[in-house]
């Protein structure tokens, strides 16, 4: 069974508690369960992970090469300044789609810049947890080609 790796960055372990008016009331566990079921219904496996540590995220991106069909990445605040994560994405041939629960472009100005987006297949923002499902559909559709 093909695998889609889902990587969530810093503070996403606080989903459901942290600013629910912005990020929603679903917990990270809820999100992971939802994505696992979503993938299984399409004959795929979702490998869901979260870390508050940049090095873990980099290691997982590297691990995706040759192990996963694609990566859904919510780098959290690392989006705006982690050239190390950007370079990790650029170093693999596996497609990566960047996802953000909130519309980062409608928030504080520091959130408007993504150093990671230019090396991803695409970016989905502001659609809540459905954004992850749309990213998965895009990766699965890309697999068919």
UniProtKB/Swiss-Prot annotation:
Its EC number is 4.2.1.10. One of its GO terms (molecular function) is 3-dehydroquinate dehydratase activity. Belongs to the type-II 3-dehydroquinase family. Keywords: Amino-acid biosynthesis, Aromatic amino acid biosynthesis, Lyase. Substrate binds at residues 74, 80, 87, 101-102, 111. It comes from Halalkalibacterium halodurans (strain ATCC BAA-125 / DSM 18197 / FERM 7344 / JCM 9153 / C-125) (Bacillus halodurans). Gene3D superfamilies: Dehydroquinase, class II. Pfam families: DHquinase_II. Catalyzes a trans-dehydration via an enolate intermediate. The gene is aroQ. The record marks 18 as: Transition state stabilizer. It catalyses: 3-dehydroquinate = 3-dehydroshikimate + H2O. Pathway: Metabolic intermediate biosynthesis; chorismate biosynthesis; chorismate from D-erythrose 4-phosphate and phosphoenolpyruvate: step 3/7. This is 3-dehydroquinate dehydratase. The keyword DNA-binding does not apply.
């Amino acid at each position: 069974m093909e695998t889609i790796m889902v990587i969530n960055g810093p503070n996403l372990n606080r989903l459901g508690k942290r600013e629910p008016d912005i990020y929603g009331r679903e917990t990270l566990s809820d999100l992971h369960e939802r994505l696992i079921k979503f993938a299984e219904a399409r004959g795929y496996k979702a490998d869901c992970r979260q870390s508050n540590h940049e090095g873990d995220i980099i290691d997982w991106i590297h691990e995706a090469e040759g192990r996963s069909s694609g990566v859904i990445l919510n780098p959290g605040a690392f989006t705006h300044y982690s050239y190390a994560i950007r370079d990790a994405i650029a170093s693999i041939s596996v497609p990566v789609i960047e996802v953000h629960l909130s519309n980062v472009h409608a928030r504080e100005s520091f959130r408007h810049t993504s150093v990671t987006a230019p090396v991803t297949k695409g970016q989905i923002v502001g659609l809540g947890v459905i954004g992850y499902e749309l990213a998965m559909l895009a990766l699965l559709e890309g697999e068919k080609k």
